[in-house]
Amino acid sequence: MHELPYGLYIIGSKEADGEKVNGMMADWVMQVSFNPRLVGVAFEKDAHTLGNVRKHGVFSVNLLAADKDSMELARPFAQPHSGTKVRGRKGAEATAVHYKLDGLDHRLTERGCPVLDAALAWFECEAEQYVEIGDHTLVVGRVLDGRVEREAEPMTSTYTGWTYSG
């Protein structure tokens, strides 16, 4: 499973209190329908962002470029929100990062979801289904809006060397 290549995406959400926005890295993201336009995103069942999506019903998907600047931008998003998820990590990688969008250039969609200024492309989704599958929850979202901002190769697990698998 470690050898399966995936795209790497930043999933944006409004915090439960509605005051702040946050983001997490996801690699289990896929289109599941042309008509209507639906995507699926798999979240760990205890993911902070999943709680935000359940509360507000919307999320954004940001695609990043396969380049050095985007790698640095993405690095904090690979950190967990909770310190309980840092087992086996050392040094800076063992630190929980709460508000990963703080200090990063971004804007909010009409529905309040964050879009990174550095994104190659983005889309905003309304959650339609939550499917419990093993140790993850698959959120099926209807694409409401989105745009390709620029052309470049998208970031993948093959490019970064990062893996998330069991």
Task: Identify the residue ranges that each predicted region occupies.
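Basic, polyanion-binding surface patches
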Residues: 1-166
